[in-house]
Design a protein with these regions (language model features):
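Small-residue-rich hydrophobic transmembrane alpha-helices
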Residues: 52-112, 149-168, 265, 279-280
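Short alpha-helical transmembrane segments in multi-pass integral membrane proteins
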Residues: 1-22, 80-147, 192-247
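Helix-loop interface residues and adjacent transmembrane-helix termini in multi-pass membrane transporters
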Residues: 34-37, 46-49, 83-86, 161-162, ...
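Alpha-helical transmembrane segments and their lipid-water interface positions
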Residues: 32, 36-43, 66-73, 77, ...
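Transmembrane helical elements of multi-pass membrane transporters/channels
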Residues: 20-39, 141, 175, 206-210, ...
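Alpha-helical transmembrane segments of multi-pass membrane transporters/permeases
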Residues: 103, 158-181, 197-204
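Interfacial/gating helices of multi-pass transporter permease domains
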Residues: 43-63, 130-134, 196-197, 239-246, ...
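Residue-level signature of the transmembrane alpha-helical core
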Residues: 22, 26, 30, 64, ...
Length: 280
């Protein structure tokens, strides 16, 4: 880690450090919200209102995926930061490699389970016969592109832990801008005319672009993350438990948002059904 980042984490005035790290993190959080907003705007213009409803049904799935990725990312970042303070390079390395291993495995499992039980899951989340087709089209593509997305979330937390919050911010900006550019090209008839599938594809490509940027930063000589791809497959069960336990509160907090959306979707569906029955 270079002297400037070392000073930031260990010597610089606390207020200055908080501002330096908090501003990029805040911008990154705002940018995160742009993904679904941009998809919704372009889908509304390029497809129809039913497709917008489908994105709302699909949103809890993405929130749950994000909750898992943040659990791993925040848990590993916390362990990495404490190890860095102790100058414990072995624990720093194990926390990073284990987090990446967990990201790949968890993402693969969620993708497979999600693709197999997608329609049943969406009906549980409040989908109707009108919008479930759009939701399936959207999530079939999103789930396939899950691994780079999860790794991007994990690496963003880890680069923040080593004092490079700007890298995480730029990664998110790259993803958001790429999504904004690709959405109309893939969705509208003057482009590829793929509709909801186009929105999902644009999102996946945007996330891949963001992942490539943060991954290159993470393996650069300036980074202290010490990613060793050759040993990535080696399982450290003790570290898996540590990361999961440390990040579990974050998982619960983020997953609760997904369950709230699911509850609202089902209430809306129930009201709509009751209204149709009453009008008939």
């Amino acid at each position: 880690m270079n002297k400037a980042r070392s000073d930031l984490l260990g010597i610089t005035d606390v207020k200055k450090s908080l501002i330096t790290l908090a501003i990029p993190a805040t911008i990154a959080m705002i940018v995160t919200g742009l993904y679904n907003l941009v998809d919704t705007i372009f889908v509304g213009q390029g497809v129809n209102e039913t497709a917008i409803g489908a994105l709302g049904i699909a949103n809890p799935v993405q929130l749950i995926i994000m909750a898992f990725a943040l659990m791993i990312g925040i848990g590993s970042a916390s362990i990495f930061s404490r190890a860095y303070g102790r100058k414990d390079k072995e624990t720093m390395h194990r926390s990073v490699n284990t987090a990446l291993f967990m990201g790949v495995v968890f993402s693969a499992i969620i993708s497979i389970v999600g693709l197999v039980f997608l329609e049943d899951m969406l009906r549980l989340f409040g989908a109707t016969g009108e919008n479930i087709g759009y939701a399936v089209d959207y999530l079939n593509i999103i789930l396939i592109g899950l691994v780079p997305f999860s790794l991007q979330v994990i690496l963003n937390n880890l680069v923040r832990a080593e004092g490079r919050a700007k890298i995480a911010m730029i990664s998110m900006l790259i993803g958001a801008v790429t999504n904004i550019v690709l959405d109309p090209i893939f969705i509208f008839d003057w482009g590829f005319g793929m509709g909801v599938k186009g929105a999902a594809l644009a999102t996946v490509f945007a996330r891949i672009a963001a992942f490539i940027y943060v991954f290159k930063a993470a393996i650069s000589k300036k980074s202290k993350l010490d990613i060793r791809l050759k040993t990535l497959h080696q399982i450290d069960l003790h570290m898996v438990v540590q990361i999961s336990a440390t990040g579990f509160s974050s998982f619960v907090r983020n997953a609760m948002g997904a369950f709230l959306v699911i509850l609202i979707n089902n209430i809306i569906r129930r009201i709509a059904i009751d209204g149709d029955v009453a009008s008939s």
